[in-house]
Amino acid sequence: MNVFDAVRNLGSFRSADDKPVERKKVGKILEAGRHAPSPGNVQSLEFIVIEEEESRAKLAEASGDPRLEEAPVAVIVLADTARMRRRIGDEFHDACNAEAASAVQGMRMVAKEEGLSSCWVTGFDQMAVKTGFGIPENVEPMGIIGLCYPRSEVEPDHRFGMNEVVFYEKYDNQVGSVFDGLEWEGLHENTEIASKKTKRFYWKLKERLSDLI
């Protein structure tokens, strides 16, 4: 699978098979994370590999996401925020988030290449994770990746069409209206999601108000 196809088809598993994930594959995934771009080349990221069922259950409880217990392997992505702050200054947290996001994307891409599926979990109980896994004060968990062989085929999430999110020279100048015959994939995709539903609601409300006036 080439990089473009991997990016377009990347999705999160819904249910994990109990087949073990080979450590050779885990190592390759971690190498991808280790080589992520880093602001100022600080290289703030660190990783904890979790395999024990009891430990995975802790992650599931802290995050409210049962997939982290189902998946045979989880990786806690950490950032040494103190190290980043010394180099970057007050914007250190944004820099750590950027580095972590870049690492996670690369790790998930390699996981897909290796025939695995993954999920990226944030919004968990930070203190529970720090306490449960002995993480020091200057290091912050940025997210958790679950790795598995999926129990069923993983479908990528729906995306906005390119003409809804790509503009030319100025905002709202849709790129498809500028380049006649442009053959970019996704250019003619239209997705029935939030913005369009909001627009429909607005016009229906406007019609009702017109009837009342």
Which residue ranges define each predicted feature?
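Acidic, surface-exposed loops and disordered segments
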Residues: M1-I213
